[in-house]
């Protein structure tokens, strides 16, 4: 009888656990920020589970350790394509369809005109949710005042030679497309004009 009682309690607790996990929690900027600073949460396997993906300006020839081009190092100006939007040429940095969140965006530039416009389109909308000069979006004051979630490093380095970081989570329910517009870019993979290096998680 004792074993039966233990079995009933175990089944009951298991059902509560399953039912609890069936409840969908809304993923928002607020929930993601809370997750980032909750030390207890960091020690547990995430629920709902997720995968970390990265898009970057990595040299597309570097695909496999077995390849002769594994050490190809033209890790700049490698975009997914080009969109023409209202007469603008927007280079595509990221175009993801499943639900997710941008949790880290790093970029650095060379021969930068300081006029490049970054746009983040969320959930198939034609109007960007975020739009502004690249470095002001990442480490300036467009999304956040100066703080730990948006920094350019190192302060000892000339501003345009720094790495610019944004850790403010930006969730999306359907899709996210990130584009970059700059008249100083000379095309995909072309390094004769402005140069952009980036990583987005």
Residue ranges and their predicted role:
Residues 21-201:
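Beta-strand-centric surfaces of beta-sandwich/beta-rich domains
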Residues 8-9, 55:
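A ubiquitous, low-specificity "background" feature that marks scattered single residues
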Residues 10-19:
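Hydrophobic h-region of N-terminal signal peptides that target proteins for export
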Residues 1-8:
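Bacterial N-terminal signal peptides that target proteins for export
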């Amino acid at each position: 009888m004792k074993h039966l009682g233990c079995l009933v309690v175990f089944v009951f607790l298991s059902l509560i656990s399953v039912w609890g996990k069936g409840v969908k929690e809304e993923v928002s900027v607020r929930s993601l920020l809370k997750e980032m600073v909750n030390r207890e949460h960091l020690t547990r396997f995430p629920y709902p589970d997720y995968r970390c993906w990265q898009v970057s300006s990595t040299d597309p020839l570097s695909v496999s350790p077995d390849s002769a081009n594994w050490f190809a190092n033209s890790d700049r100006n490698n975009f997914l394509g080009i969109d023409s939007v209202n007469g603008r040429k927007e280079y595509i940095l990221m175009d993801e369809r499943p639900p997710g969140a941008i949790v880290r965006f790093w970029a650095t530039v060379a021969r930068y005109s300081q006029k490049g416009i970054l746009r983040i389109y969320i959930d198939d909308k034609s109007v960007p949710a975020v739009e502004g000069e690249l470095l002001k979006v990442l480490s300036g004051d467009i999304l956040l005042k100066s703080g730990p979630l948006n920094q350019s490093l190192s302060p000892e380095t000339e501003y345009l030679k720094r790495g610019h970081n944004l850790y403010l989570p930006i969730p999306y329910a359907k899709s996210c497309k990130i584009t970059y517009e700059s008249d100083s870019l000379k095309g995909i993979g072309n390094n004769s004009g402005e140069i952009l290096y980036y990583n987005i998680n």
